[in-house]
Amino acid sequence: IVVIYSTAIFFKEACTIDENLTTLDQIHEAAKAEFLQKGYKDASLRNIVKSLGKTLGAFYGYYKSKEELFEALVGEHYQYLIDRFKDAQKQFADLPHEQQPEVMGDISGVCMFDMLHYAYQHLEECKLILCCSEGTRFSGLIDEMVEIEVEGTHAYQRVLAELGRPSPPLDPTMEHILITAMFH
């Protein structure tokens, strides 16, 4: 099955659920397949449980809503990505100002590598966040990271000015466009 979201194409094998899994794990696997195929907004709890030969009652024994299920699938992964990005920003900001220009690429490079490595280790969950989360709080991951980066950029501009190396002022719209493009 080929699933197309935005400009990304993902290949998803037909969903076959291991019957040896617990009911909860079966729900998670079926939900991942449904969300990857249809996105959060168009995914159906009925389809998820029907694909397992279960009832909605079985589902509601574990979760109160589709939103709660999606949170269970991606919440920890979303939090890891945001926390890792914030940690890199803090590591950089905590350096002596004189060192910052010399190591900026090092810290951000390690952060991006770590985040990409994590995303590949948790590929389906990260695809859910980045491509299938419209209608959830997770759909704002890139926007949240852009805002963190904008704040970091402004702090770094102040450091450069303090070091006698001021950077030219940035138009806020252009700054937002450039930083957003960096994440896409």
Question: What is the predicted function of each stretch?
Answer:
Residues 30-37, 80-91, 125, 181:
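Solvent-exposed, amphipathic alpha-helical segments
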Residues 1-20:
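N-terminal intrinsically disordered/low-complexity leader segments
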Residues 106, 110-124, 135-164, 173-180:
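Amphipathic alpha-helical packing segments from all-alpha helical-bundle domains
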Residues 71-80:
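Alpha-helical DNA-contacting segments of helix-turn-helix folds
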Residues 72, 86-118:
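Hydrophobic alpha-helical connector segments
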Residues 95-102, 129-135, 165-167:
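Short linear capping/connector segments at secondary-structure termini
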Residues 26, 30, 34-68, 72:
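Helix-turn-helix
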